[in-house]
C-alpha cells in the first residue's frame, strides 16, 4: 500500500501508520529529532492533533487566521508571521480545497522553512495540476472512515526526503532500527545512543 500510495501521490516515500493523528505526531517528532524545535505556524481551523503534535514535541504554535474562500490559512499572513525562530508551517487543506499559493511556496523555499501539508481532507486535490501533499517537506493523510478514502483507521506520512523517511520508519517501529533498512543510518543512530 505504501508503494502504491507513493506512486499515486507522486512522492518517493510513504509510511503507513495507525491514524492521521499519529502521522502528525510522528512528523513533528521526526522534525524535532532531525532539526530541533522552534515556532510552527498553524491554523485555528484544523483537527486538534495538528496543534497537539506541535505542542507535545516542544514547538511553539503561532496561529494565523483562515481565508473564508478556501478555509486555509491566509498565505500573506503566514509570510508576515515568519521570524528567525520559525521552523515550519503546518498548513491544512480543508474540505478538498487547495490552501497553497506559489508566493507562499517560493517564500518558504527561499527562507528554508519546512512546509508540512495536512491533506487528511483533500486526497487528490491539486495545485496547478500537481497533487496536494507533494509541495512540502512532508505531508500527512488520514484514512479514518469519515474521510475521502477509508481503511477504517490509518494514516500516512509522505516525503521525498530519505533521512526523514528513515526516521519516521524508526519512530513508527517503537524506535527499533530494524525498520529502517539502511545500515548507514542505523550506525549513525547507534553512535548517538
Residues covered by each model-derived region:
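PLP-dependent aminotransferase-like
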Residues: 32-110, 114-119, 126
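Active-site nucleotide-sugar/metal-binding loop of Leloir-type enzymes
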Residues: 81, 131-134
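Phosphate-binding glycine-rich loop
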Residues: 1-39, 53-55, 63-65
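Conserved SAM-binding loop
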Residues: 16, 42, 157
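Solvent-exposed, non-membrane alpha-helical residues enriched in polar/charged side chains
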Residues: 2-6, 28-29, 52, 79, ...
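Active-site region of PLP-dependent enzymes
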Residues: 122-128, 135-193
Amino acid at each position: 500500500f505504501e508503494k502504491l500510495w507513493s506512486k499515486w501521490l507522486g512522492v518517493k516515500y510513504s509510511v503507513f501508520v495507525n491514524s492521521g493523528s499519529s502521522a502528525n505526531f510522528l512528523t513533528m517528532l521526526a522534525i524535532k529529532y532531525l532539526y530541533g524545535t522552534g515556532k510552527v505556524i498553524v491554523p485555528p481551523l484544523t483537527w486538534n492533533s495538528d496543534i497537539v503534535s506541535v505542542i507535545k514535541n516542544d514547538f511553539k504554535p503561532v496561529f494565523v487566521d483562515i481565508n473564508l474562500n478556501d478555509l486555509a490559512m491566509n498565505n500573506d499572513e503566514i509570510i508576515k508571521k515568519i521570524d528567525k525562530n520559525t521552523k515550519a508551517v503546518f498548513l491544512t487543506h480543508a474540505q478538498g480545497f487547495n490552501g497553497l499559493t506559489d508566493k507562499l511556496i517560493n517564500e518558504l523555499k527561499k527562507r528554508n522553512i519546512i512546509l508540512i501539508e495536512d491533506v487528511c481532507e483533500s486526497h487528490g486535490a491539486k495545485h496547478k495540476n500537481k497533487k496536494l501533499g507533494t509541495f512540502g517537506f512532508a505531508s500527512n493523510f488520514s484514512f479514518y472512515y469519515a474521510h475521502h478514502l477509508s481503511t477504517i483507521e490509518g494514516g500516512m506520512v509522505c516525503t521525498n526526503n530519505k533521512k526523514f523517511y528513515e526516521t519516521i520508519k524508526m519512530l513508527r517501529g517503537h524506535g527499533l532500527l530494524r525498520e529502517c533498512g539502511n545500515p548507514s543510518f542505523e550506525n549513525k543512530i547507534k553512535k548517538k545512543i
